[in-house]
């Protein structure tokens, strides 16, 4: 991973008061902290969540987060004002952290803030993940040409000496040259001393920052497997947890300041949230079935977004009632090489348009009485299901899997209008018309005087329609089949699986009803397919519905099991809120 930027120095950290630190220090600290670092502004109103602070303590000591019962009556969140922010770095590990000073309920306290329009000098920077060659004892550090030109001082051939300062204030000297075959920019003399002192290994990240005056800064980011190597403390983890709570409680009761330590390198849910960000998250009204996306940084420092679905809204711990921190239980769409939480906070995710926002008129059709003169319309629908018109009526699940956004529209569609050419086609089939060609010429020695019977191109379709017509005479109910189903039947296979779609989940599942003995087994099987773990049995958050051959939706469980197996065409899992909406719009039968 290599990145280069020309940015206004740390606009996100404007307002930090730390007289001993310059804007170059702030910019280097931010790059070493990573792109997901979120620091509040000086004087800003924030919400502080003690639960998140305890999680950070546990993660720092590599202890599992357990449900700590508060030793005092402390709210799940405190409204505070940011008094001061100090950006620091560990002496031994170069791990960045911030000391944030907070004061609860400071509505009458005047706190000086730095103007947002204050001039911030431009800086150039680049980062690079170190390779085995970069960290070898006899090698050097190769700088990409683009970054060398933009971020390093102009090189007077054949070489120059660079002086760079790290976050501790230590100065490092590197020899910068442009040599080799092919010629490349490299740092040689002094580089080995730097990597040895910092104990850099393959996979770590090097950061260079250059200001307008030519000042050069250097920093590092540890690979994920090296982070969190904190020595054992004589203070027990329980004492540290209770210390977090006691400190916040004392500050709340006595209207005094308290200091919170934030470590960007540790994957934990944000527990100091700006007031505006919190309100924006709450206004989204996340409910079960909502779709979202969330930013992550992988072990290789690559940043990407992962998509998921909210499957539950509840407290993370019974000891912290009505807490928004990690209150959303989620299910991820795809696999990741690193662990992701199954419970997140509303302000960490970005809300997406869910299946709830798709107009129901385009998803479902209402059940109505079938008129006697609608036979031509049924034929028209069958003709759409024919191989010549596959794209109009049928979409294979493989196509849906490749384009998840289309899966939301995979419900039964509105009936096709009556088409004149379908009536003409039926007339031709019933009259069994054949085309005869008579000629007195010979072609390649073969007499063409004999009448040739040319098969009608819709003969095979006509045979299927004739069978359906005969079935209708005996009152049999026929359903449309996809080309894949027709093909599988031609080879002697019978499809017994029923498609299952869960609200908010892009990829559907399939269940074989022929191996199940009743609704109880069906519910257990659906819970396994979507990893719901008993949530369908309680019916507190999810409801199960199904569609019949006419696209009419009904709740599961009202019909005898054999009748249900005959009627069902698709099984749908809705949130309880969506079921209420469907019933109110009369799209779902009670």
From Swiss-Prot:
Alphabetical UniProt keywords: Auxin signaling pathway, DNA-binding, Nucleus, Transcription, Transcription regulation
Annotated GO MF terms: DNA binding; DNA-binding transcription factor activity
Subcellular location(s) of the protein: Nucleus
All copies of domain PB1, residue ranges: 495-576
SMART domains linked to this entry: B3
CDD domains: B3_DNA
Domain of life: Eukaryota
GO terms (BP aspect): auxin-activated signaling pathway; regulation of DNA-templated transcription
Gene Ontology cellular component list: nucleus
Signal peptide from the UniProt entry: none
Pfam families on file: ARF_AD, AUX_IAA, B3
DNA-binding region: 126-224
UniProt subunit comment: Homodimers and heterodimers.
Role: Auxin response factors (ARFs) are transcriptional factors that bind specifically to the DNA sequence 5'-TGTCTC-3' found in the auxin-responsive promoter elements (AuxREs). Could act as transcriptional activator or repressor. Formation of heterodimers with Aux/IAA proteins may alter their ability to modulate early auxin response genes expression.
Recorded family membership: Belongs to the ARF family.
Record note on domains: Interactions between auxin response factors (ARFs) and Aux/IAA proteins occur through their C-terminal dimerization domains III and IV.
This protein's name: Auxin response factor 20
Species in which this protein is naturally found: Arabidopsis thaliana
């Amino acid at each position: 991973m290599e990145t280069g930027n020309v940015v206004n120095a740390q606009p996100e950290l404007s307002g930090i008061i730390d007289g001993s630190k310059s804007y170059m220090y702030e910019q280097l600290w931010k790059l070493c902290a990573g792109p997901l670092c979120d620091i509040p502004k000086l004087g800003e109103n924030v919400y502080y969540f003690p639960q998140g602070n305890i999680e950070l303590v546990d993660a720092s000591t590599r202890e599992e987060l357990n449900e700590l019962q508060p030793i005092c009556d402390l709210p799940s969140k405190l409204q505070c004002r940011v008094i001061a922010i100090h950006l620091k770095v560990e002496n031994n590990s170069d791990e960045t952290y911030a000391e944030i000073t907070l004061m609860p309920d400071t509505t009458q306290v005047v706190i000086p803030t730095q103007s947002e329009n204050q001039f911030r000098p431009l800086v150039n920077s680049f980062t690079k993940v170190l390779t085995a060659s970069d960290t070898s004892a006899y090698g050097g550090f190769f700088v990409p040409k683009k970054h060398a030109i933009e971020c390093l001082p102009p090189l007077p051939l054949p070489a120059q000496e660079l002086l760079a300062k790290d976050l501790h204030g230590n100065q490092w000297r590197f020899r910068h040259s442009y040599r080799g075959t092919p010629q490349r920019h490299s740092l040689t003399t002094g580089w080995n001393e730097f990597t040895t002192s910092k104990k850099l290994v393959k996979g770590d990240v090097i950061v260079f920052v250059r200001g307008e005056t030519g000042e050069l800064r250097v920093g590092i980011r540890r690979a994920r497997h090296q982070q969190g190597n904190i020595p054992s403390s004589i203070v027990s983890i329980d004492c540290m947890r209770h210390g977090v709570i006691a400190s916040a409680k004392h500050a709340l009761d006595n209207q005094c300041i308290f200091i919170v330590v934030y470590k960007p390198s540790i994957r934990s849910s944000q527990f100091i949230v700006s007031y505006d960000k919190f309100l924006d998250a709450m206004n989204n009204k996340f409910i079960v079935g909502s779709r979202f996306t969330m930013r992550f940084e992988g072990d290789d420092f690559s940043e990407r977004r992962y998509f998921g679905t909210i499957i539950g809204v509840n407290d993370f711990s019974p000891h912290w009632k009505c807490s928004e921190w990690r209150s959303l239980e989620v299910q991820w769409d795809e696999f990741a090489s690193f662990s992701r939480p199954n419970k997140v906070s509303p302000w960490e995710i970005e809300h997406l348009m869910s299946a709830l926002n798709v107009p129901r008129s385009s998803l479902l059709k209402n059940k109505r009485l079938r008129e006697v003169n609608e036979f031509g319309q049924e034929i028209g629908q069958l003709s759409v299901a024919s191989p010549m018109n596959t794209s109009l009526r049928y979409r294979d699940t493989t196509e849906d899997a490749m384009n998840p956004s289309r899966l939301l529209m995979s419900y039964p569609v509105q009936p096709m209008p009556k088409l004149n050419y379908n009536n003409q086609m039926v007339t031709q089939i019933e009259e069994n018309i054949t085309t005869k060609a008579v000629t007195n010429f010979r072609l390649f020695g073969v007499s063409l005087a004999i009448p040739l019977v040319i098969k009608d191109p819709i003969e095979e379709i006509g045979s299927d329609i004739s069978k359906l017509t005969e079935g209708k005479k005996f009152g049999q109910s026929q359903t449309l089949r996809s080309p894949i189903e027709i093909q599988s039947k031609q080879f002697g296979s019978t499809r017994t699986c029923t498609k299952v779609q869960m609200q908010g989940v892009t990829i559907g599942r399939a269940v074989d009803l022929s191996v199940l003995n009743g609704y109880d087994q069906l519910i257990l099987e659906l819970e396994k397919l979507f990893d719901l773990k008993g949530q369908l049995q309680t019916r507190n958050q999810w409801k199960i519905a199904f569609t019949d051959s006419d696209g009419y939706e009904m709740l599961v469980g009202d019909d005898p099991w054999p009748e249900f197996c005959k009627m069902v065409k698709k099984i749908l899992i809705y949130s309880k809120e969506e079921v209420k909406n469907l019933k109110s719009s009369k799209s779902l039968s009670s």
